């Protein structure tokens, strides 16, 4: 997507009208992002949810977390973050369930059960979908962040996100573009950021809380991850990892690890990279993939049941770090045009 007109062209006025009608007709609404939420998932849930709460004060609106984990520390500054509740603790049968930043229902984790109890389902998303799971979907694959779609939808409905709510949406945009350093940071993304700042969003607060407030314990873990970086495929693929025991030894929680993949991505000459984090006693892993160019790492994530974009994707896998690397690294080598058989796993 090269300009804001492209974003407008993928928005159907009819679908938006029908979504608004569902919102207006619902007495109870539940909104959720994906499992292991990032800034865009949380910012989109909060931006949409808080806006609807202000515009429709008599509606029962629940803001859900797909997991039982707490809100990641770096995102707790956002307005309304204290309103987010685990989907497993929500017992309602909402008239309307709204999914944001979720391409497949499996990524809803515990929120999928709430979806199944709902009368109607709506989806806002910017990922490609293998199949639609919602009654109505406002899907714009070219948008840099789901927060952009939420902002445009609200504006088209006559609802303007301002100040703290606008900051939530800006956080989604900033984090999903890697501080406007990824390939998706196009003219439309900058235009959306300008709109949000004009409406009171605070970019300095986003930068401070998300990127400039690291705990010393996290920096110790970061140094471990940096020390483990390896490259394969003639330096075109990089990877690193952290065991659950590393997090425990450093005093770091799992939710603080968002962003460690960018340490691996920063290696000169690397085209794609992988960061793995051990969970559940290192019997499972969560993986983050990044690409510096046009190579599509979401294809790799899809092989593990995950998803994402060309430049950024994630997945979970039942297996150890070594086992996951043994499968993923040959795929990444093939993606960059190198011989998969040449790859050996080093820990």
Predicted regions and their residues:
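Hydrophobic helix-and-loop "lid/oligomerization" segment in the mid-to-C-terminal part
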Residues: 2-35, 43-76, 91-96, 175-303, ...
């Amino acid at each position: 997507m090269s300009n804001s007109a492209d974003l407008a062209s993928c928005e159907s006025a009819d679908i938006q009208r029908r979504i608004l009608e569902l919102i207006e007709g619902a007495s109870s609404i539940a909104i959720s992002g994906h499992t292991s939420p990032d800034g865009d998932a949380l910012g989109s849930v909060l931006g949409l949810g808080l806006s609807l709460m202000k515009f429709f004060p008599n509606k029962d609106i629940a803001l859900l977390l797909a997991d039982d984990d707490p809100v990641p520390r770096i995102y707790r500054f956002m307005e309304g973050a204290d309103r987010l509740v685990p989907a497993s603790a929500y017992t309602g049968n909402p008239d309307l369930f709204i999914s944001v930043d979720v391409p497949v229902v499996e990524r809803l984790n515990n929120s999928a059960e709430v979806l199944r109890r709902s009368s109607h389902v709506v989806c806002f998303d910017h990922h490609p979908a293998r199949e639609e799971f919602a009654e109505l979907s406002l899907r714009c694959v070219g948008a840099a962040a789901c927060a952009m779609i939420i902002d445009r939808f609200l504006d088209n409905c006559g609802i303007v996100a301002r100040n703290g709510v606008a900051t939530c949406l800006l956080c989604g945009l900033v984090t999903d573009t890697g501080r406007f350093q990824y390939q998706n940071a196009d003219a439309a993304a900058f235009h959306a950021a300008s709109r949000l700042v004009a409406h009171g969003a605070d970019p300095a607060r986003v930068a401070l809380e998300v990127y400039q407030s690291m705990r010393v314990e996290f920096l110790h873990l970061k140094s471990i991850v940096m020390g483990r970086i390896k490259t394969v495929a003639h330096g075109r693929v990089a990877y690193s990892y952290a065991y659950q025991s590393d997090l425990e030894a450093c005093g770091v929680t799992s939710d603080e690890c968002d962003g460690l993949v960018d340490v691996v991505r920063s290696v000169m000459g690397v085209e794609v990279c992988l960061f793995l984090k051990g969970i559940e006693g290192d019997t499972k892993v969560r993986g983050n993939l990044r690409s510096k160019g046009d190579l599509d790492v979401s294809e790799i994530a899809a092989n593990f049941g995950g998803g994402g974009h060309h430049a950024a994707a994630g997945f979970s896998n039942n297996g150890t770090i070594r086992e996951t690397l043994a499968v993923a690294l040959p795929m990444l080598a093939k993606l960059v045009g190198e011989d998969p058989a040449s790859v050996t796993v080093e820990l």
